[in-house]
Amino acid sequence: MDFSIKGCDWSKGEAKGFLTGKSDCIVLGIFEAQTLSGAALDIDTATKGLISRVVKAGDMDGKRGKTLFLPEVSGIGASRVLLVGLGKQDAFNQKAYNDAVTAAWRALLATKVVQVTFTLAQLPVDERGSDWGVRAAILALRNETYRFTQMKSKPEPVSHTLKRVVFSVEPADEKAAKVAVKQAVALANGMDLTRDLGNLPGNVCTPTYLANTAKQLAKDWGMKAEVLGLKQIQALKMGSFLSVARASVEPPQFIVLHYQGAAAKAAPIVLVGKGITFDTGGISLKPGEGMDEMKYDMCGAGSVLGTIRAVAEMGLKLNVVGIIPTCENMPGGNATKPGDVVTSMKGLTIEVLNTDAEGRLILCDALTYAERFKPAAVIDIATLTGACIIALGHHNSGLFSKDDALAGELLDASREANDPAWRLPLDDEYQDQLKSNFADLANIGGRPAGSVTAACFLSRFTENYPWAHLDIAGTAWKSGAAKGATGRPVPLLAQFLIDRAGQ
């Protein structure tokens, strides 16, 4: 799909090109109380009051998400007009904007339009420029057009005909909007990769499949990929990681993906993704109902690969290292048992009280491995705890960090990217719940504050660099009729890296 930018100040009568230019449809916003947006006012004048008459007649009341097509409109170059309800003007925020653009795309994709002129990006949203509106609109469109068909014997053909979108933006935002287009397309491509990996079944997306995906990314984008096998993992003494992998016939893989966009000596940002390609719970077996969704337990790994793909396409001027410990968590005759004690790469011994708390066991060795890169910061991403879903639901990812500056950067990025996160506590008092009579620490801390104690466990392995943890158990995928991976938190991570790169 082709996206282009055209500057236009509707309030100064600069709309002639939009009024006369050929297009299948022009998209206009209407607020409640019969208030026309700036672009709608100009179109109303050009069509001799048509928009006003439609609104006055009650055919378009401006309620958020409502849409109305006006066919065969005379006086303008577009063959039809799509009116989109924006809701109340004094309550128009990021969510209202996203609701409006999503409604617009759904209406357009159900038609045979090929080229669209899109004016909604110029609407004022929380003091953001129209470049932000362009990026959000493209991501919303790509979300609506995403389909996972790889496992279908006869995939349904693409039904929409939309091929080109022209965004009208404020003239002062034109340059930034062109950058936003590039970033949005790269980001959407990264999210699509993350979603594809998550949606693949566990018998296809194995640890080896993830490793091969990383190798292909490196080949496609001029990066370096290292994949460590069982013997190399054993040589590194990653006993905690190996304790999870031992009962599966699928060999574990330890993936390291290097993106170099800055000088080789520049300290990298390290992203560590949990890569459990299927999680039965091990000997602490999960209930059968809903276990199919445990193919999504590698979405942390998928988000690392998707983020680095987006970073490479954007050409960000910084260094990023992706680390992915990946394996299956299976029961078996040689599986780790509750009560077993294992030794981590760091040398700390861990009493495994519950084999279904396995994500932290593979991540702790990866976090220790990350030290060798002398990182500027390390962020781990994991579908780690059901407790995080209880605490935050499916809207916010859980953010944990003792570094206020790093946490602040990530929260700012989450707001800018419309990929929300919420900071949860990481007080030392919670560490007491991880005490063990038989090892240096236990892998679970009981029912209270389960997501917090999981983060506390990881913090024991991150003392030598700035670190943050994102628990995406509630946000990495959706259940029910809309079941599927979401691609989150790729937008948050990519925005954080864009900000760090100063781009």
UniProtKB/Swiss-Prot annotation:
PANTHER family with a match to the protein in the record: CYTOSOL AMINOPEPTIDASE, LEUCINE AMINOPEPTIDASE-RELATED
Origin species: Burkholderia multivorans (strain ATCC 17616 / 249)
PROSITE patterns: CYTOSOL_AP
Signal peptide residues on this chain, from the entry's feature table: none
EC number: 3.4.11.1, 3.4.11.10
Annotated binding of Mn(2+) 1, by residue: D279, D356, E358
The protein, known as: Probable cytosol aminopeptidase
List of residues binding Mn(2+) 2: K274, D279, D297, E358
A single Gene Ontology CC term: cytoplasm
NCBIfam families associated with the record: PRK00913.1-2, PRK00913.1-4, PRK00913.2-4, PRK00913.3-5
Needed cofactors: Mn(2+)
InterPro entries for the chain: Leucine_aapep/pepB (IPR011356), Macro_dom-like (IPR043472), Peptidase_M17_C (IPR000819), Peptidase_M17_leu_NH2_pept (IPR023042), Peptidase_M17_N (IPR008283)
Membership in a protein family: Belongs to the peptidase M17 family.
Gene Ontology MF, one: manganese ion binding
Superkingdom classification of source: Bacteria
Cofactor note as given: Binds 2 manganese ions per subunit.
